[in-house]
Every structure is written in structure tokens, then in C-alpha cells.
Amino acid sequence: MADELGTTEREIIAQRLKKAEALRALGVNPFGNGWQPRHLADELLRHYGDQPAEEIAKDPGDWSLAGRVLAVRSFGKAAFLRVRDRSAELQVWVKKDRVGEQAFEVFKLLDIGDIVGAEGPATRTKTGELTLEARTFTILTKATRPLPEKWHGLTDVEQRYRQRYVDLVVTPGVREAFVKRARIVSGIRRFLDARGYLEVETPTLHKPEEAGGAAARPFETHHNALDLDLKLRIATELHLKRLVVGGLDRVYEIGRIWRNEGIDRRHNPEFTSIEFYQAYATHEDLMRLTEELMHRLAVEVTGGPVVTFQGQAIDLTPPFPRVSMLEVGARALGLSPDDALAGRGLAEALSRAAARENDSEDAWKLEQAAKKTPGEAVALAFEIFGEPQLPKDRPAFVVDFPLETSPLSRRRDADPRLVDRFELFAAGMELANAFSELNDPADQRARFEAQMRAKAAGDEEAMPYDEDFVRALEHGMPPTAGEGIGIDRLAMLFTDSASIRDVILFPLLKSRD
């Protein structure tokens, strides 16, 4: 195996291409097929555990593994390889007198990053490391471009995201984070399936009047054959509720959502959500279900109910505390909840709050809130002043949402100024949004009309008027509660990832100039 240090990448690639030709000369296809491992590295490691060499020698087995070479220590006629498959890393010992002259000639053409196959018994070396002692050895795939093995992973964060295929190989913990993400999704599926929910698929391309379900700006496209303007969905909500009207009392969808908005450590324009709807349930029922789901996922994915996020321990043991948006938002403005919702003294309170706000963007938002409804102003005050004060060591349900913030939520019977809604926050992030669904078609029509007025006044995130959805409600939707959970942020929490890009395999990035 040649030393590649000190040469340019172009020279290394040229060297490796020559080695690929040398493999062909030996009768080995450097990009062959048909060699299948019978075992995983983790199986061998678990089988022998901490058994001493003497015990392993009594039953060394016949193991067959394949994986990528991460490191090589060569000693003339023998070498130790670090090989990783999808389960674990394992040391492989290649000796000329064990694998034979032909196979050792193949080995000498090996480079870090190559994918190899090896068969042989298990042993424990003098240094105490559990090892596969190769009886047969071959190169299955020649890597013609080198891995950045000189460094402990990629040092350029942008390069990590652009070349995730390399990041997964060389950066510690990345593979494990995405394995956890997959376990989160499968855990949610098991949880809902066990409770009688039906998984469905709804359209991702919406006609302009259907592109609702959230306050967000959609991406737009055009269908050439139908000469039809379309929008990528910003939520699955309205189609899922149509299914509840049709008698599918418990439905859910895990799917991609697109929102034409900014990018930061918690937002990506393309993300994954789970939305589920249950007839004959209230938002209170979903609070209890959410507590149970979060606790179970924490145990299944991390091994216990307490997770650590950026140095902060967060206990997901139910019940979760509740925080009133109305109470906190109004008090932050120096008003009583009743005065705030009635708009009494609200403009002056917003002006005072803006004057003392250090963040210029938040100050501008507070000034502009005087043009919005009182409920929207209270919600903004909570976002700016209340969210940073939410519990750090526990998730929390935010409740008592003003009516104007929730065009699809059911009014609260005891106080029609509010809606039956909650949001779940943890680690400073909104993880879930849920409410008892509005099923009064006349009320829904009126709220859509209010949204259209807001859109005409310049609100690009206002929802369109979906006449077909109102028609569906006129056929009768049973009392229903629904919830949406952001899979990506949930993965951030359970993998201790500071950026949403760390839990999306291929996040959207700017084009390189």
C-alpha cells in the first residue's frame, strides 16, 4: 500500500486509477459485484464480547464481513485494517501466509476508502483487540478519490453538508445521528399504528386555492400538460381533514413540506412533518397522547426520559407544565389579558415595548403589530418576551391562543376569544402544534374571508379561500383534534444537534459562485 501523504489530490486520483488497472491485470474487477457478506461487524463483537483469546480460540467461527477501510497499519507481510460496515468498526488482520500470494498482491493495491471483503476466524490480538483474521481477502470497490483522513472529519461545515456521503464516513457521530432520526420516524409509526391510526398519502402539488393549512409562503410551479399553476404544499392538514369527513377517523401522514421562507439553524425550506387527526377527541386528549409519545421516543431512542441538548438536561417525564400565551403576552406589554384582547391601551403598550427593545428587528415587529389585531399583537409579544422564559429543563405546553392566530382552530366554549390549541416547546424550539379542529362550515368560511382580506392588505402568509374544504365541512366532520410535529426539530432534540442541517441528509444550500 503506497503512502499518499504529500501529494496533490489529482496525483492521488491518478495513482488510484493505475491501481484499478493493476487489479484488473490480477483478474480482480475493481468495481465488481456478487460478493455478499454473511455477517455484520457488530455480530462478531457481540458474540465474543470480552472473552479472552483462549476462549475465542476454542470456537473462533467462520466470519464473513465487508466494509470500508478507514485506516491501515502495515508491517511488511502483514497489516491491520480498520473496517467499518453499517453496524460497527472492526479490526481485520491480513497476513500473506494466511491469505496467500495472490490475495496479498491484491492487498498491496489497497487504499484507505476502498471497500473490501474478508472471511476468516475471530481472534484477540496481543493488544487485546477483537479481530477477524482474514483467510480470504479481496477489494470489492476501489475508491478513486481519497477521503480527508488527515483530519478528524471534515473541518468545513459547508463542505460537510454538500458532501454528506463523505461526512457520513469520516465525521464521528454523523451516521449515528441519522440512525436515531430513522428510529424516531419508525417509533412514531409504531406508536400511532398501535392506536388504530391509518397512514395515508395526500398530494404534494396543490392548486392555488388548496395551498393552505399554515401561515407560510409556498413555492410555485407550473404543470405544462394541464397548463396549470400549482404550489408545493405547506401542510397536509386540509386534505387529512377531508379524509376524516369521509370516515377515516384516525389518520396520519409523514411527509415532506415546502415553505418559501428564510433559512437558519431551526428552519429549512424543505422539511418533514407528521400530522395526525383523531375524531371524537379534543386538544386535551392530544396533550396526553403527546406526553406519552415524547416520553416513549426519548426512552427508545436515547435510552431514558432525560435527554441532553447543548449542555441542558431536559426531562420528558409527563406531565408537562402549561404556560398561557394570553397571560404572559399581555403582562409583557403591561396590560391585563382582558384589556389586551379588547385593544385598550394596546397601541401605547406596543410603542413602549418597542422603545425598550434592544433587538432592532423585534422593535420593528412590535411597532408594526399596532396595525394587526389585538390577538396577533399578544401572540407577537409572547414570541418575543415569553418564549425565552419557557422552562429550560422541561418541555412546556403553550396554551390560551387568541382566536385571530388560528384560522383553523375551534373556538373555546368558555371563552370564544380564544381557541382550543396548544404548542409544545422544548430546547427553545416549537416541536408540535395542535388544536381541536374547527368543524363549523359557516365559521370556517368567515375565517377564510378574513384571511383573504389580510392577503389583500399585503399579508403573503395569509391562507387562500379553500371552497372545497368548506364544502367538505358542510357534509359534516365529527368533533376532531389534530396535531403536527416537526420531525427535523425532534431529531435535533434527540441527537443534541444545534442546527437543523445536522439532521437533514441533504439540506438546501446556496449555489457556489
Swiss-Prot record:
It is an enzyme of class 6 (ligase). The gene is lysS. Its EC number is 6.1.1.6. GO terms for biological process: lysyl-tRNA aminoacylation. It comes from Anaeromyxobacter sp. (strain K). Homodimer. This is Lysine--tRNA ligase. The keyword ATP-binding applies. Mg(2+) 2 binds at E430. Binds 3 Mg(2+) ions per subunit. It is found in: Cytoplasm.
